[in-house]
Amino acid sequence: MARANAHRGEIEAIIDGERRILCLTLGALAELETAFGVDNIAELATRFADGRMGASGMIAILGAALRGGGNLVDDADVRDMRVEGGIEGAVRLTARLLTAAFMPERETSAANPLKPQPAD
């Protein structure tokens, strides 16, 4: 299997003991717009900005990202999957995916500690 490419927004994770690539592609984001009942990407970003997320939202995001990464799964499959690190690992993975999609410069910096961090 190919390695994840952070420049394309891909994230690598161990799920059900297998290394998988996840990516919130445009198709995955369109899928999430429908799932969350919003009309555009800006509304989707606003929806995620408050940092509150239920389990069903995480399933939708992880499912869309798995499919965006080329994995043949549906949300029913995702419900039963085990992310390395348990629920905490799933929360971190979801946050990384959203960061890669909506703030790619931060994900690249986090993945590469040698890259200078922007001042806040």
Question: What are the language-model segments listed below?
Answer:
Residues 1-14, 39-51, 68-120:
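Charged interaction scaffolds used for protein-protein
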Residues 57-68, 96:
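Short, hydrophobic/amphipathic alpha-helical patches that form generic packing surfaces
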Residues 26-43:
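Short, surface-exposed, low-complexity cationic segments
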Residues 24-27, 53-57:
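Generic recognition of short, well-ordered alpha-helical interface segments
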